[in-house]
Structure formats: structure tokens, C-alpha cells
Amino acid sequence: APPLDAPESLQMTQVSSGWFNAGLDPLGRNKLVPTVSFRLQNTTDDTIRYVQLNGVFRRQGEEEEWGTSYVHAFGTEGLDAGSSTIEFRLESERGYTGEQARDEMLAHSGFVDVTMDLFVKHRGDQWVRLDSIDIDRQLLTQ
């Protein structure tokens, strides 16, 4: 089978993003981590099988990774033509910590916004970037 053209075959839908309260760090400070939720829709006429996802987070203006989040999207069961997956939720293990209230952290002058690039791997093919999401500067409660 020819390699899957992921950007032409899979589409991110129902995308939402923000900063999730990851609780307290070992020093008792609030920790916020960037989080993206979405579904994938199969926009082809065929069933697609064996897809893995990797979200790569970066602070805007920086090259280095600021956390990754991997998920095995689906295997042999596949994703039928035109249908959508369950909701996936990718969050970085890295985030911001602060003594101040969480909403104050988002307004802090040192706060740098974060972007997540979503990469897709089909079977044994190379990872391909599917989309890029700027994380909304909002608090997520769940």
C-alpha cells in the first residue's frame, strides 16, 4: 500500500486547548501544563489502521522541545471512512509553576505562550506533522 498522506486523510476536529491545573509541585507551588483535546476524523473513503500520535510542545520563539505527549490512536480495528475517534487529550509533562494564583500565572509578564505540533505516524512510515495548535491562554478545570 502507498504511504498514507496524513494531512489529506486525517483532520483534527473539536479542538480545544488551555492550561490544566496539574496540582502542586514538591515545593507546594501551583503547576499549570499546556493541554490540547481533539478528535481525529478520517476524511478518506477507506478504513485507516495503525496510527500513532505525538504532540510536541514548544514555547513560542524557542526551538527546543518543551514536553511531548504520545498516544497510540488506533490499531487493527482502524478508523472507518468518514468517522471520528474518541477524544484524545495530550498534555505536556512540563509546565509553569508559581506561588501566585493560577489565573495570575497566566497574566504574568514572564508567561510565554506555547504551541503544540501534532505528528502522525501510520504503520512504519515516517512521522508527519498534521497540524499546529496555539494553546489558548485559559484555565482548564478538568
Task: Describe the function of each predicted region.
Residues 1-35, 62, 133-142:
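Low-complexity, acidic Ser/Thr/Pro/Gly-rich terminal tails and inter-domain linkers that flank the onset
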Residues 15-20, 53-58, 91-95:
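Generic short beta-strand segments
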Residues 16-25, 37-39, 69-75, 99-102:
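Short structured motifs
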Residues 28-32, 47, 106-110:
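A generic structural micro-feature
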Residues 40-44:
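Asparagine-centered strand-capping/turn motif at beta-strand->loop junctions
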Residues 45-64:
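Short acidic, flexible loop segments centered on an aromatic residue
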Residues 68-141:
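Short, solvent-exposed, Trp/other aromatic-anchored flexible loops in extracytoplasmic proteins
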